[in-house]
């Protein structure tokens, strides 16, 4: 899930880019990219659970990644780009495990789901130039999004599983 995908979503209050899961304190982007810190690039989401549930956020997450690739994501290769869900308590862990199992059972993907579900550890905020990157450099972000293969991957796996808006419009009354 990128910042671009998490905002604006009703109920999401704040999204911060950063690093987590490793053994180096206060890692820099360069250190994380070296693949030697054990950290993954991640985002930390603050949300209002009266408006959006953890499960709903997970459903959004699954539709932004390739959960079958344990070597990174699209154009970003290396363990620091592997997908993971970091949980903060047993309830989140169970919801995440159920969500992953549901995705696996859906057979949307031909390969095994390899996204890890692991306890949250200290989160280190990324440098300022990595915050809101999609807003600061929209052209670069959009070129990467399409050029990396992510756009086509997401479209090919999820468009058929989304509501056909034109068909839905036919069922609505004029007031709706």
Q: Model features per residue range: what roles?
A:
Residues 1-4, 8-176:
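Flexible coil/turn and secondary-structure edge motifs
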């Amino acid at each position: 899930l990128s910042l671009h995908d998490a905002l604006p979503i009703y109920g999401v209050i704040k999204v911060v880019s950063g690093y987590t899961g490793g053994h180096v304190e206060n890692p820099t982007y360069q250190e994380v990219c070296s693949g030697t810190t054990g950290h993954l690039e991640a985002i930390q989401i603050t949300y209002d659970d009266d408006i959006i549930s953890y499960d709903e956020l997970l459903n959004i997450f699954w539709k932004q990644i390739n959960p079958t690739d344990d070597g990174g994501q699209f154009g970003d290769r290396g363990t620091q780009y592997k997908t993971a869900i970091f949980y903060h308590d047993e309830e989140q862990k169970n919801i995440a495990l159920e969500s992953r199992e549901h995705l696996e059972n859906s057979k949307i993907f031909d390969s095994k789901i390899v996204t890890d579900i692991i306890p949250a550890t200290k989160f280190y905020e990324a440098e300022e130039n990595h915050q809101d990157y999609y807003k600061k450099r929209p052209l670069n972000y959009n070129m990467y999004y399409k050029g990396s293969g992510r756009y086509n991957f997401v479209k090919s796996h999820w468009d058929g599983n989304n509501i056909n808006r034109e068909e839905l419009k036919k069922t609505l009354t004029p007031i709706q």
